[in-house]
């Protein structure tokens, strides 16, 4: 059976938005007004939902403004900005349709990002490299002008949620291979029919423990995960059974240790880094990684400097 057919039921339905916001991916921006938030909400990476891959091809994207020499670096494209200016001068004539046009455009763009993420996850599961030509032909299609934005957001999604990085190994042929973040040897796949790597979830847990010190109480882990809308006893659309991941899979892979707090009555439990995590990465690398993907110092790690000094002495 083709890989794409085997993996159809593995697509998550929702959850990326909350995870991206909680990790600070869009938190580095200045506060926006309600109108600005409404206009730009669908442009953020974390609104991409893999379960919303369209069955039919998205409509053609708008053509670039005449004379434009480079792709805009934000989602507030000059084409739409000019449309807003024009519409603001016509308020007395009736409501403008340009905001609706932008909303539709941003939604279509987000679907393209979601479709590319799903395509890349299939490639990762098959352990195959991917080329720019494949991405353009299989996913992007006539949205080639916006490929840099689509590719950037899809790459950020892979790194933030799934713990996967894309590395260009052939700049001429634009060939990319997949690598797990922080050089971890764990691919995050739990079975033959899984395309949703759990490496990103593991990195989040390692970061929570590092933030706490040498160990983290189990209740603290769940408190932090609740911000990502991941809860004990509730199946997650991306990560599956989080309790089983934490106390069984990651422990069996030697990335975590799960033990009873000595002398606790009633019994309390805590998590520590396992021997495999200690060999493959370090506290400071994990914390630096989380700060990087958060887009800035929104997540506070007071022990970051302490651990950096400690590792420098070793």
From Swiss-Prot:
The keyword Phosphoprotein does not apply. GO terms for cellular component: nucleus. Residues 109-308 form the MAGE domain. Ubiquitinated by the DCX(DCAF12) complex specifically recognizes the diglutamate (Glu-Glu) at the C-terminus, leading to its degradation. The keyword Ubl conjugation applies. Pfam families: MAGE, MAGE_N. GO terms for molecular function: histone deacetylase binding. Residues 65-87 have a biased composition (Polar residues). Keywords: Tumor antigen, Ubl conjugation, Ubl conjugation pathway. Residues 1-99 are annotated as: Disordered. It comes from the Eukaryota. Coiled coil: none annotated. Residues 21-44 have a biased composition (Low complexity). Residues 1-20 have a biased composition (Basic and acidic residues). Expressed in many tumors of several types, such as melanoma, head and neck squamous cell carcinoma, lung carcinoma and breast carcinoma, but not in normal tissues except for testes. One of its GO terms (biological process) is negative regulation of autophagy. Activator of ubiquitin ligase activity of RING-type zinc finger-containing E3 ubiquitin-protein ligases that acts as a repressor of autophagy. May enhance ubiquitin ligase activity of TRIM28 and stimulate p53/TP53 ubiquitination by TRIM28. Proposed to act through recruitment and/or stabilization of the Ubl-conjugating enzyme (E2) at the E3:substrate complex. May play a role in tumor transformation or aspects of tumor progression. In vitro promotes cell viability in melanoma cell lines. Interacts with TRIM28. This is Melanoma-associated antigen 6. The lineage of its organism: Eukaryota, Metazoa, Chordata, Craniata, Vertebrata. The gene is MAGEA6.
């Amino acid at each position: 059976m083709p890989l794409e057919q085997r993996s159809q039921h593995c697509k998550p339905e929702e959850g990326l938005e909350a995870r991206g916001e909680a990790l600070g991916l869009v938190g580095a921006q200045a506060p926006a007004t309600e109108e600005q938030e409404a206009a730009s909400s669908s442009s953020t990476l974390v609104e991409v939902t893999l379960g919303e891959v369209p069955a039919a091809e998205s409509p053609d994207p708008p053509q670039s403004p005449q004379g434009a020499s480079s792709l805009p670096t934000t989602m507030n494209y000059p084409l739409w900005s000019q449309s807003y200016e024009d519409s603001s001068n016509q308020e007395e004539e009736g409501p403008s349709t340009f905001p609706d046009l932008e909303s539709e455009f941003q939604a279509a763009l987000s679907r393209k990002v979601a479709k590319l993420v799903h395509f890349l996850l299939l490639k990762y599961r098959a352990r195959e490299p991917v080329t720019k030509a494949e991405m353009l032909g299989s996913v992007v299609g006539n949205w080639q002008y916006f490929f840099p934005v689509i590719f950037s957001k899809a790459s950020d999604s892979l790194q933030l949620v799934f713990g996967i990085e894309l590395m260009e190994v052939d700049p001429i042929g634009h060939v990319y291979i997949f690598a797990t973040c922080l050089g971890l040897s764990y691919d995050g796949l739990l079975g033959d029919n899984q395309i949703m790597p759990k490496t990103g979830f593991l990195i989040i847990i390692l970061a929570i423990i590092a933030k706490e010190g040498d160990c983290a109480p189990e209740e603290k882990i769940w408190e932090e995960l609740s911000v990502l809308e991941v809860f004990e006893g509730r199946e997650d659309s991306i990560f599956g059974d989080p309790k089983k991941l934490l106390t069984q899979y990651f422990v069996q892979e030697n990335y975590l240790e799960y033990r009873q707090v000595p002398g606790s009555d009633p019994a309390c439990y805590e998590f520590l880094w396992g021997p495999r995590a200690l060999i493959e990465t370090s506290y400071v690398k994990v914390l630096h990684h989380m700060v990087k993907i958060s887009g800035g110092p929104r997540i506070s790690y007071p022990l970051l400097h302490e651990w950096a000094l400690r590792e420098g002495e070793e």
